[in-house]
Amino acid sequence: MPAEIKPSAPAEPETPTKSKPKSSSSSHGKPALARVTLLDGSLLDVSIDRKAIGRDVINSICAGLNLIEKDYFGLTYETPTDPRTWLDLEKPVSKFFRTDTWPLTFAVKFYPPEPSQLKEDITRYHLCLQVRNDILEGRLPCTFVTHALLGSYLVQSEMGDYDAEEMPTRAYLKDFKIAPNQTAELEDKVMDLHKTHKGQSPAEAELHYLENAKKLAMYGVDLHPAKDSEGVDIMLGVCASGLLVYRDKLRINRFAWPKILKISYKRHHFYIKIRPGEFEQYESTIGFKLANHRAAKKLWKSCVEHHTFFRLMTPEPVSKSKMFPVFGSTYRYKGRTQAESTNTPVDRTPPKFNRTLSGARLTSRSMDALALAEKEKVARKSSTLDHRGDRNADGDAHSRSPIKNKKEKDADKEAKLREKKQKEKEEKERKEREKRELEEKKKAEKAAKAALAAGAAAGAAVNGNDELNDSNKSDKSSGRRGVGIFSSGRKSKSGSPSKDGKDKSGKDKDKEVGRLGLVVTSGLGDNQQDQNLDEAARNAAKNRGSTTPGVTRQYEYAVDNDGNTSPTRKSYTPGGFRYDQDPNSRKSGADGQEQLSPTSQQKKIGLAFNYAPGNENALKETAEKLKAGQLSPRTQDKLNRGQLSPKSRAKLLQDPLLSPTTRAKLQGSAVDAAAVPLSDSQKRSYSPTKGPQGYSSGAPGSYKPISDPTADFLESQRYNKEPGYVGPSKADVAAGLAGAAGSKKPGSPTKTGKGAPGAAAAAAAGAAGAAAAAAKPKKRRVKIMVITSKFDPSTKRIDAENGSIEHSTGILDPATGLIDTKYGVIDPKKGTLEALNTKTGKKEVFQGDVDGKTGNLHLVSGVADPKTGRLDDTLGQIVCITPQDNPVVELTVITSRIDPATGKIDTVNGDVERSLGVLNLDTGLLDTKYGEINTRTGELKAIDPKSGKIVVSKNVKVDPGTGQITILGIVDPKTNKIDPNQGRLIEVGQQIDPIVEVTSLAGKFDSKRNIIDPKTAQVETSGGQFDPKAGKIDTKYGQIDLVKHTITFNDPKSGKTVTRDIKIEPTTGQIVLKNQVNPKNNKPDKDYARIISLRIVQQRVDPATKAPITEVSASKDKDIVVDPKSNQIWVPTGATDPATKEQQYISSSVDPKTGYVITIYGYLDPKTNEIKKQTKLDPNTIKIEPTSGKIYTATGEVDQATGEPLYAATQVDPESGEVYTKLARVDPKTGKIVIVRILLISKTDERGRPEEIDPSTCEIDPVSGRVLKFFNKTVYVYNMIDPVTGEIVQVDPNDPRFAGARTTVTHTMTLTGEIDPVTGRIKSEYGDIDPNTGDIDPATAVTDPVTGKLILNYAQIDPSHFGKQAQVQTTTETVPITRQQFFDGVKHISKGALRRDSEGSSDDDMTAQYGADQVNEILIGSPAGQAGGKLGKPVSTPTVVKTTTKQVLTKNIDGVTHNVEEEVRNLGTGEVTYSTQEHKADATPTDLSGAYVTATAVTTRTATTHEDLGKNAKTEQLEEKTVATTRTHDPNKQQQRVVTQEVKTTATVTSGDQYQRRDSVSSTSSGDSGTPIDGPYDGASVVRTDNQKSPLFTTSATTGPHVESTRVVLGEDTPGFSGHGEIISTQTVSSKTRTVETITYKTERDGIVETRVEQKITIQSDGDPIDHDKALAEAIQEATAMNPDMTVEKIEIQQQTQ
């Protein structure tokens, strides 16, 4: 905060607009309060006119901060849909806020590309704060090296020079927050780099910080999520240079501002018109799709503003249309541009501003405070800045760049001499200084006490509203102003009591500390300034004697004769550091002499923020206390600094005030954060010692992301990302605070300055809570039913019977217990609802009552009319909340006799019953009316009807294939004994919503016939909600308990909640309620009764109209049929029997014994007008798979593709425990069940929706229909080995550089293992693997035993290094290489010579050896055929040859058998060739596992050759697909793997005699490693030379033009290879750019026969000069990519002439 600020009333800020007279109204006359979060995290309250525009507010803020270059800054605010929206500075601020307090955030909007061009240090200081926040919040990703470098400047700015005595280890860095996730390795690197920055002032460190930060890729980029034209998720970034496009965290395109002609948006689309290129004729328009029109407009406005600010000299004026209306947006940026800001002269003295809060920490040589007489000596010793008398006053006075300026030679020599003298006097001065410090200590203590007493009296008389422009007076202001660039924010009012300050309150001590921070270089005269510094030194000495840690250090900086105090006018080397440079070498310039700052004429002392105050012993004790767990970054920071009083500490730990997902503070049920003033302990602070926070949730009912999408996009780019790190909100520990809520309140301060023992208990509780926060429970979905009706104030009763019912879904946060719903945030414990008051426009908390009997929430205030959406005081609401922990599933039960021959239940003649069950996903238990069935162990827990005890029987069988449950032996209802010949077949259907369709029949009750009089009967349909755990159903008539046979409702007479018994009619299973309210007199009538039929439906729609149940009109109730004899209520389903055309009806029955609801189907007989119950198998609602007997039940849905009805069946996988539902349709032709979708119920998202799986990606048993492999994920990762570094890199297969190159390998991995539901990673023996990228979590990664390196990607796994080599021996044949195989790339090389990454995907899978290893020689278009074809048509018909190779590998006790069957089919001629091979090998004697392995690999290769004889061009396309399946049957386990590999290659060959044309052949030897290949010079494709002894000098007899060439020889052994070698084959393929010669030969050495492959690559050009270095690099890169195992043996560069 600058010290030179003229006092002004905050209510009258500096604005360029004229303020209108205030209204006489009190609401408009009272000034508004804008609560602004500054860049250091502190809060600033600004009083301003309500009619003020945004520019007035930012002018007031910049005036208070003493900023002149204010055009780079802006204000942001939060909306329900966007957590970071820029405030329009030309509109009134009151337009964007409805509350009295305007929450705003001060931020940098336009990032200058060159920070050194900023004119003032204070502007750079605030830019540094913004960049620091961007790094810590994840918007600016950095690498390890960048984090270390920037962190070293952070440490230099805060702590000064490195001191080996005080900083022997990296312990002094433990309080620094350098990176979002920092490690010990990073701190070591920071410590090493910190040593190299000796002598840099804080201002210099700031400029170094910015000069390195501007080089980051995401510096100043404003990201917006979008989709491209193909629907792929991308991010659009707006920056100073133009528009950037990102996809999968990589920048894939850039549109510079000069290349863009026009930007526009329409609805949710954003368009840019591109200027045509040099060879383009028309303009092109590119469109992007955004989430909504608001997002599109936000992106458009950002582009307009950035383009105007950085590219234009002045803003574009808004054109005024006179005659024609303007349909587009007239928005234009009206602020000053960068050019105007740069050209505006600054005619003031550089402001002096504080980078400190208070105190001094005298532990560094460069920061020691001495007497004023010794100030100059300390300056010489601690800084590389030279004496003022030796400066050149006019040498580059305006240079602020860290680039080293040239010095005059004479000045350099003198500087060198002075440096030598300075070193000689160093030891002597240190001893003198220590002696003086001891003498001045007592004097400083007395002076400090007197100054503090006077300051306290002055601070007590300050008005709180003066804080905006007067930082020297108010303690409130000192809590907000004056911090170092990397400080942790403002100091709270609750300071930490010191040992000798026990008689002072924390508040008084904080005032003292706040005043101490304002005595530094405040623009006074030199004498007064020296006095202030002397007083600061004495106060520092006083602090040195106490145990209160000082929070500042002194530093020196240069002041010129004009009073310019900019500390950045020192020249230094760019970049700031070098790894190979001596740390002491920074004292010298380029020629070894000391650097000089030409503008510095005088040394001054300032105060810099000390980031790790206090003695080391106290810090170590604090670290030991917090070792068991970690509090939130805010709490831990203040505890380490001792800045929390015991009272504040107890309040913070006892109240879970911080929401884990929002920045806002929750009080009770989330009181509006804007309406409640925040205390100091709740104010946000972005700092290096504070973790990032998420964004606050907005208005109720809007489900928006809890974090910034920009942060989500950049999250994975963070250095050393933690395992399972899901976003910034993870740093918060609300659970930890909640865990500490029960701790005792710490007592008053003791003599030692510590709290009562309760503080230790609170810290321990917070640590335990932090551990609980690490395992944060997942949010769960709950069902909500709301009954809205009239509220009677006299009886305080809500008329629920005549109310409207609405069903919805809410999200329960287990950490807070709050439920986020469309109505607002509900606290079920306190009975409150936080919702938006439509009358006041504010969020308010409405108090309700929680019914102790039903648990429902009754609200009589804050209730909105469902029709209008406005609050209505005459309405009341009953909110019923039901958890959805386990899914409710339909059960189809067939009870019949057991066939003694097959042991199966007769499903055709059995009785069918439809009921419900609750399936526990974790244990596999199925709760049914027949008992609790364990689907894994086959146990049945049921209640014995005689004894009433739980009996466990094992007469349950679960079919592992179909998942059907069979109960053998059931109780005969007649004899009440178990009949072993009877059984039940239970089939689990689909998961349904616990929504109840309540159909009631009310009227005069006939007690004799036990029915309702048909004349007075009235039918009504409504909704209900079913709680399967409690067995209760909430309806508008009350809460029905099906187990206890009771109903709980609100008595209309007394208005109290009462519980009455209900009667369940045994014949119909319907509920009979007597003594109901008669609608005629609106009073209870003993003769008036109501019969209720409950049906739990799978959809909340009417079967005929598909309308929601709550909207079914009374006219639809006429279709309901009531049985006149039994009053059974039948509801039409809308379906008919296709054979008899009878209408289908449905009813329900409640089992009186178990309370389970049973669904009954029936058909209406048109003759008798009666409904017949369907007790047998109904083919319209149930389908049976003929092969497996699996039962599928109708869902009521239809297939979107075919329109046929869908049937469902649910199954529990016996091995993995996964629960999945198969949705299928019946093929009308074959009658077979065809699976359409698979829903994985056991894997749900945050809202409870099951994961949907495509059946085509699953392996389904054709017999039983069981999904054998459905949760394994097949991932396509494209990798290649970097020929320079040897590392595996991932490439984009669509990149033109790789699409046609032979170096591209499509690597398919099969990752098998349990999927972590939180992180989504697959757990394997090599670590937790990300299925999307193949990256392995570093925390669980293993080390390669051979290389010793950590395996961080699945492709880096070499199974042979882990002893997993295949125990198979086969006979191999060496086949001469062909031209076709050369086009195929590296596939022709044996596995011994080349190990592709695809082997790593199937480590112990034997198909890796046989998947695509069998390559057959296919000669397409021989040279003779080509020569003869020249006389025919210019263009020939394409030749297509399809080769199918099937390999079956069987390993058993007898050994290994390998069968190969091959079919070569010429699709043009119809010629088919078959061939078979068989290889056998004996079993390995060491293999005693007894495993039986069957591996099948089917490879399909389609080669298409298109020959253009007129152009002598041939285009060959090769597509290959290999599907390898391995099944391992082991006594202990069964495993199956499937590997699919696809390779596509396209090559264009120009053959014939083109080599004879010499006139227009271009030299294209670079940039196209796989581009056009010409034919050999003699017309032959393959040249073979036999029986040559020296393979290194084998040449081919080709003739061609004499060229300048570079030859690269690749081989596996040394150049001096000795031995007898026999040439097997040679091949030479030439083009106009290169010649590749491949030699295959075998040699015998020491009785061992080896096969070697050697390649010679010659780079050539047709007579043109060649770039040897470039050509050589390309040759090595291509050859190494083709065969990574080969090495370069010899490089020859020759000059050949004709």
Curated annotation (Swiss-Prot):
The modification Phosphoserine is found at residues 471, 474, 478, 566, 659, 687, 697, 1398, 1401-1402, 1590. Transmembrane segments: none annotated. Keywords: Cell junction, Developmental protein, Phosphoprotein. Residues 562-571, 594-603, 684-696, 1533-1554, 1584-1599 have a biased composition (Polar residues). Residues 1286-1698 are annotated as: C-terminal (CTD). GO terms for molecular function: actin binding; structural molecule activity. It is found in: Cell junction, Septate junction. It comes from the Eukaryota. Residues 1-31, 335-361, 374-710, 1509-1599 are annotated as: Disordered. This is Protein 4.1 homolog. The modification Phosphothreonine is found at residues 689, 1407. One of its GO terms (biological process) is adult somatic muscle development. Its main location: other. CDD domains: FERM_B-lobe, FERM_C_4_1_family, FERM_F0_F1. Residues 12-27, 449-461, 1561-1571 have a biased composition (Low complexity). It comes from Drosophila melanogaster (Fruit fly). One of its GO terms (cellular component) is septate junction. Residues 317-434 are annotated as: Hydrophilic. At onset of germ band retraction, expression is seen in epidermis, hindgut and foregut. During retraction, expression extends to tracheal branches and salivary glands. Residues 374-448, 499-514, 579-589, 618-627, 1509-1532 have a biased composition (Basic and acidic residues). Pfam families: 4_1_CTD, FERM_C, FERM_M, FERM_N. An integral component of the septate junction. May play a role in cell-cell interactions that are necessary for proper development. Vital for embryonic development. InterPro entries: Band_4.1_C (IPR008379), Band_41_domain (IPR019749), FA (IPR014847), FERM/acyl-CoA-bd_prot_sf (IPR014352), FERM_2 (IPR035963), FERM_central (IPR019748), FERM_CS (IPR019747), FERM_domain (IPR000299). Residues 32-314 form the FERM domain. The keyword Transmembrane does not apply.
